[in-house]
């Protein structure tokens, strides 16, 4: 679907009809929705067992796929932010319903937009850079066991279990969890 979407690039024109624009937005939504579903599954699978090589592999594959798809549809985002004048942007946004605020928000970042090739590099580095480090950190720290006194008993728990106490509304419990 993302490959098919790439063909729209040649048809982008700030003077297009609202109907055409909404059809393009619908395609972007469909692609994003599908990626969210499969990415969500991979993320939940990984979150349920960060030590699982299978879940880690699936998560890595989905991150890579997400980056590839983002790179394929990136041109639309950049076109919207940098190549559509204010008058046409307002005209096109008028009939977008609940997406109007989102589209207006996107345009606020126009001055920070990089070239398409630079944005693609950033998308790719997100998968191999910080995301990879976070996964490695999770894999290492999720095998640690922590001892915490809860009531009259000392409990042994994982980092994830301890995090529940760190976020407690009770300040004394939070303090104990941090120690």
Name each model-derived stretch.
Residues 1-179:
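A well-structured
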